[in-house]
Amino acid sequence: MAADNAYLMQFVDETSFYNRIVLSHLLPANLWEPLPHFLQTWLRNYLAGTLLYFISGFLWCFYIYYLKINVYLPKDAIPTIKAMRLQMFVAMKAMPWYTLLPTVSESMIERGWTKCFASIGEFGWILYFVYIAIYLVFVEFGIYWMHRELHDIKPLYKYLHATHHIYNKQNTLSPFAGLAFHPVDGILQAVPHVIALFIVPIHFTTHIGLLFMEAIWTANIHDCIHGNIWPVMGAGYHTIHHTTYKHNYGHYTIWMDWMFGSLRDPLLEEDDNKDSFKKAE
């Protein structure tokens, strides 16, 4: 038992270290040090998530909409400031709830309820990468079906997912739309990351990093720029999802859509649009 407690303390020490790093640079000590460990962790996740959302979003928008204007997107496809402000407002209302999920997952890990491990040396590098691959496949499968059911189950779409799908044209989508969800919707789509903890051994620090990478990834797939990197589910695929509502539910890759018959290729979409335009002429 003492050995188990000593092992679990590695997780507590690591989260406490992250709390100090973030909170000590953003808040006076008297505001956060008296808080219980759980609330410190939530506050750290909330502040870090908010900073990541705005910094990545602003840098992304500045680059593609201003430095590279008319390079990646035509000027008339750039979303309005008003649309981006609305996306920020929706995301900020949900952010306190979004960041509760990683806080709860860290708490479960600290209590030893999951298969998380503290050091890569416990399994070695080969198994580390094998477990990451299994973890990501599980997450991909889980997010695909969670996302698809949020469309197929009408009450879930009406009361949850429709909040995100008001951005249904290229000139209304921006990197800031990536987290503009109803909070319950956003949490449901991230739940596979937490369920995976009980099934697949995963390195603790890697799990935290993958959760926060979601903010970067969701910004990327809402910028409407088709990178055309197989088998990545990039923004070209996701833009089709926002316009057809019934294709490209996948997350990182196109594999789940390919397996379950919901894939629509943006290059084929362009060809179809060109053919339709020629017929109209």
Curated annotation (Swiss-Prot):
The keyword Membrane applies. A motif (Histidine box-1) lies at residues 147-151. It catalyses: a Delta(7)-sterol + 2 Fe(II)-[cytochrome b5] + O2 + 2 H(+) = a Delta(5),Delta(7)-sterol + 2 Fe(III)-[cytochrome b5] + 2 H2O. GO terms for molecular function: delta7-sterol 5(6)-desaturase activity; iron ion binding. A motif (Histidine box-3) lies at residues 238-242. One of its GO terms (cellular component) is endoplasmic reticulum membrane. Changing residue 234 to D: 98% activity loss. Its EC number is 1.14.19.20. GO terms for biological process: brassinosteroid biosynthetic process; sterol biosynthetic process. Changing residue 114 to I: In ste1-1; 85% activity loss. Its cofactor is Fe cation. It is found in: Endoplasmic reticulum membrane. Pfam families: FA_hydroxylase. The histidine box domains may contain the active site and/or be involved in metal ion binding. Involved in the biosynthesis of sitosterol and campesterol, a precursor of growth-promoting brassinosteroids. PANTHER family: STEROL DESATURASE. Belongs to the sterol desaturase family. This is Delta(7)-sterol-C5(6)-desaturase 1. It comes from Arabidopsis thaliana (Mouse-ear cress). The lineage of its organism: Eukaryota, Viridiplantae, Streptophyta, Embryophyta, Tracheophyta.
